[in-house]
Amino acid sequence: MSFIRARKNGGTNRVTRSTKKIASEIRELTCARVMLAAHEVDEMDSIDYVVRLLAAKDWDHVMVTDDRGSLVGRVHAVDLLKLIMNKRINRDLHWMEVVPISQAVTRPPLQVRANTPLMVAATLMLTHDLNQIAVTNSNGTLVGHVSHAVVARHLPRFLL
């Protein structure tokens, strides 16, 4: 039954209930349920290692963590390329082999907790023009990431 026909027949309660149910389901869909494994490197890994890893794995970003697994920052391949091409960091291979990636991270890293609703993560990504966002547990340890592709995979079922 269409919405217009439901209104004519006095069936607005049925439509309202289903809308409330959908809204509730959207709020209950958390990042923990849909997140992907994080592309992760240690903060002491060299810039050269990270550049090679991004190219070899065909990744567009990596999350940088410390020795406890806590999120330190995020490095996007395009941002790293811009740093190198604009000569903000030395292009010398020897230099890139000894300088840690922590020197090129985006700080502070934007992150959400595992229990954050997916809609909140999607809103943050759109607001801050990010393709992905880190997901951490209550201790701040990196547990995964959510991307536009994840959002596109899970939210359309609520819209149709």
Regions found by a protein language model. Give the residues of each.
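Tandem CBS (Cystathionine beta-synthase) repeat/Bateman regulatory domains
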Residues: M1-L160
